[in-house]
């Protein structure tokens, strides 16, 4: 690129061309020296030609001015105009190898989307003859568990130039729980097979960014179906165990329970049984007694679904036995005898002599032990439970009446209130507390309480007419 010579007059007539190259180094003129920048005579020696200002004193058109001397370190001879037309790699360093981190991954890890630069040709892309691979035998057993060969890059396949930085595909092998999920998500996506016959083609991405099955470990791709097959019997076994425990809950529905509750109530009334009889019959037949409230809530569908499912088989068996038996009332005879024995006993009435004897024993010992209760019951001809209950009731009665006996006398002393002092006009001197004040260093100061008469306490707060009524 050459420039035609300009005379000083032509340069002075066109001061507006300020975007012309003023640095010969930037224009590729290697003939000029780089030690300093000097301009020719009449070329930008007068600042007023550009900024339309007056001439500075000392600067004349006849003399040449030197501007901004640069050293040779700032030369840009290597900068050429043709370098801007070729695309360059965005990262100048070589791509790191991650083959030592993940078993089964090769050194030629393909990026997500890389194509050869525009300026490079097929000859510029170097094809390595060998690509090292790591075997999976050390950690994952023999080589039979390896995935098919189409997932691995072997010798002779296309590679990527080493001057480009690559994104490392996210490998879920570091998270064991995610490998199966990722493999299932990529089942429908077939990994591309690299072509060895056409090395000029741009390398294809390995997957959609989450890692294709080729980036899994050696035994992962083949073990996924087996893991699913193993988890299936486990889940079925656990579910079968749950069904064995709650078969009735799964088979029964709310409509079935409602229908059975109506049927139970109708047949129970027809046979002449009460809800309490049904609860007693269940206890007699199956060893677990239910209350009348439980049977009532079952018939009213007020129990939880789980409890109703547990109670329905028992009620169904009782209903079948009650319908098939000739005399259903015989089912409750033994149970009724047992219930009668457990009924509340009749109130015990003691004679006067026995009562006075117990009072005398109570004065001597309000809390007799087991041996003393046995001795008293033998002397009076009473049952031990009767004597024990009488002493308990007597102690409660003594606490209510606050009678003076043993411990209760001591407790009563704490609750006794001292009688108020008689009212008088003089002050009441209270004993000192033992803490002398600063005004009385010698002894405890006396506290004087003013005397107040009861009629005069609330006179100020009452109505005058009511006060006159109180005085009268």
UniProtKB/Swiss-Prot annotation:
The DNA-binding region ranges are: 343-402
SMART domains to which the protein is assigned, alphabetical: HOX, POU
Q: Where is the composition biased (Polar residues)?
A: 220-234
Tell me yes or no: is Transcription regulation among this UniProt entry's keywords.
yes
Occurrences of domain POU-specific (ranges): 249-323
Q: Recall the GO molecular function terms of this protein's record.
A: chromatin binding; DNA-binding transcription factor activity; DNA-binding transcription factor activity, RNA polymerase II-specific; protein heterodimerization activity; RNA polymerase II cis-regulatory region sequence-specific DNA binding; sequence-specific DNA binding
Q: Which biological process terms from the Gene Ontology are attached to this UniProt entry?
A: anatomical structure morphogenesis; brain development; brain segmentation; cell dedifferentiation; chromatin remodeling; dorsal/ventral pattern formation; ectoderm development; embryonic pattern specification
**What's in the keyword line of the UniProt record?**
Developmental protein, DNA-binding, Homeobox, Nucleus, Transcription, Transcription regulation
Q: Does the keyword Nucleus apply?
A: yes
Supply the name of the protein.
POU domain, class 5, transcription factor 1
């Amino acid at each position: 690129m050459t420039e035609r010579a300009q005379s000083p007059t032509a340069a002075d007539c066109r001061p507006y061309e300020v975007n012309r190259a003023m640095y010969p180094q930037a224009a590729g003129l290697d003939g000029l020296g780089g030690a300093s920048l000097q301009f020719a005579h009449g070329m930008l020696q007068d600042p007023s030609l550009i900024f339309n200002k007056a001439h500075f004193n000392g600067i004349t058109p006849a003399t040449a001015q030197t501007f901004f001397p640069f050293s040779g370190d700032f030369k840009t001879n290597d900068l050429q105009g043709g370098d801007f037309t070729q695309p360059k790699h965005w990262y100048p360093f070589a791509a790191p190898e991650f083959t030592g981190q993940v078993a089964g991954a090769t050194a030629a890890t393909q990026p997500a989307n890389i194509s050869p630069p525009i300026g490079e040709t097929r000859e510029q892309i170097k094809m390595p003859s060998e690509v090292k691979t790591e075997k999976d035998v050390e950690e994952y057993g023999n080589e039979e568990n390896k995935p098919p060969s189409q997932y691995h890059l072997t010798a002779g396949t296309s590679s990527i130039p080493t001057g480009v930085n690559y994104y490392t595909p996210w490998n879920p092998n570091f998270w064991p729980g995610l490998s199966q999920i990722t493999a299932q998500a990529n089942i429908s996506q077939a990994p591309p097979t690299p072509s060895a016959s056409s090395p000029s083609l741009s390398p294809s991405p390995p997957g959609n960014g989450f890692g294709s099955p080729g980036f899994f470990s050696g035994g992962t791709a083949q073990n996924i179906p087996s893991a699913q097959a193993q988890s299936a019997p486990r889940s079925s076994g656990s579910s079968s165990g749950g069904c064995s425990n709650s078969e009735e809950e799964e088979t029964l529905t709310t409509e079935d329970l409602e229908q059975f509750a109506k049927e139970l109530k109708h047949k129970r009334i027809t046979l002449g049984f009460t809800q309490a009889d049904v609860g007693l019959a269940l206890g007699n037949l199956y060893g677990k007694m239910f209350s009348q409230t439980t049977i009532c809530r079952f018939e009213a569908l007020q129990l939880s679904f789980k409890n109703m499912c547990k109670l329905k088989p028992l009620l169904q068996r009782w209903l079948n036995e009650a319908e098939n038996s000739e005399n259903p009332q015989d089912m409750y005879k033994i149970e009724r005898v047992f219930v009668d024995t457990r009924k509340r006993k009749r109130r015990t009435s003691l004679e006067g002599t026995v009562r006075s004897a117990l009072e005398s024993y109570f004065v001597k010992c309000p809390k007799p032990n087991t041996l003393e209760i046995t001795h008293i019951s033998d002397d009076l001809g009473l049952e031990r439970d009767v004597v024990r209950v009488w002493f308990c009731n007597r102690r409660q009665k003594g606490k209510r009446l606050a009678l003076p006996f043993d411990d209760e006398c001591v407790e009563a002393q704490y609750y006794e209130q001292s009688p108020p002092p008689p009212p008088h006009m003089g002050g009441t001197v209270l004993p000192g507390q033992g803490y002398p004040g600063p005004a009385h260093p010698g002894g405890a100061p006396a506290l004087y309480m003013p005397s107040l008469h009861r009629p005069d306490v609330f006179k100020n707060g009452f109505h005058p007419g009511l006060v006159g009524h109180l005085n009268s």
